[in-house]
Amino acid sequence: MEVPNVKDFQWKRLAPLPSRRVYCSLLETGGQVYAIGGCDDNGVPMDCFEVYSPEADQWTALPRLPTARAGVAVTALGKRIMVIGGVGTNQLPLKVVEMYNIDEGKWKKRSMLREAAMGISVTAKDYRVYAAGGMGLDLRPHNHLQHYDMLKDMWVSLAPMPTPRYAATSFLRGSKIYVLGGRQSKYAVNAFEVFDIETRSWTKFPNIPYKRAFSSFVTLDNHLYSLGGLRQGRLYRQPKFLRTMDVFDMEQGGWLKMERSFFLKKRRADFVAGSLSGRVIVAGGLGNQPTVLETAEAFHPGKNKWEILPAMPTPRCACSSIVVKNCLLAVGGVNQGLSDAVEALCVSDS
């Protein structure tokens, strides 16, 4: 596949969110984008639920979440949207699970989690939902792995994760669930573990080379990219924004040696990232400057280098993001105050 030139990328301003927010969860199903919950200007979790139509460039309000929440884990099972855990209006983790039927336009309560949790990582395969980790009411990270059986409306415990954590990144590849990074209390974890759905067992993979918070993970072809982030301050060490890029080769099963010339051009953390048309994209976030970053970059795997893209129209950090129809959407987030901006980085003709 031919990788597009940086000149082929452009930002489009889309219809803004109906209200400003941060920590909302996004989901694409049936070509539509759903925005679920989030926090308002006062940091209070919201019960808003809207759908965005790319064709009409329009947000439509849907029946509100029965339980207001932010940072909720979401997944689609056919024509149903499942929302799991998150933070409630009392600022505590939730055990509530709710399901929205797209055809009926109605919410239903489902079987609760065994323990309240926020920062759960969710993947779905064959109408089964897998929920890994999370942080409980006692603020301790969980090592739970549970699967939800939709036909029986039941959660079943599976083999626990070797490393307890919350806010990890997880993705499905074949019959394996890859779980990367995350946190224990305030501190970043560099564990990389894989659960085999068929054998129901965990395998520890080589740790992520650099431990950092607010980094991003992106998969492209047979590679997994670990990008940027914040090296946290401890004792005598100052916090430091990073431009590090680590690449894991999924065929070889190891981290590749990276030259400094392959690193990001800008140090950044808490940014938008994704893969578009054979390139890895990063945009916005926080860096060494006093204001939010507006810069965007694209990695060319053939040239092993980052190239400058057009700047974000509304610079932001802490955005929600999703890739839809060859566009990377940046939704809400923070620029001084909260933002309602929705912008898409698209490849020409998409």
From Swiss-Prot:
Q: Which InterPro entries match?
A: Gal_Oxase/kelch_b-propeller (IPR011043), Kelch-typ_b-propeller (IPR015915), Kelch_1 (IPR006652), Kelch_domain_containing_8 (IPR051746)
Give the Kelch repeat ranges. Answer: 1-31, 32-79, 81-127, 128-175, 176-222, 224-278, 279-326
* Top-level taxon: Eukaryota
Give a yes or no for keyword Transport in this entry.
no
Q: Which SUPFAM superfamilies match?
A: Galactose oxidase, central domain (SSF50965), Kelch motif (SSF117281)
Q: Which SMART domains match?
A: Kelch
Name-wise, this protein is: Kelch domain-containing protein 8A
UniProt keyword annotations, A-Z: Kelch repeat, Repeat
Query: Which Pfam families does its entry note?
Result: Kelch_1, Kelch_KLHDC2_KLHL20_DRC7
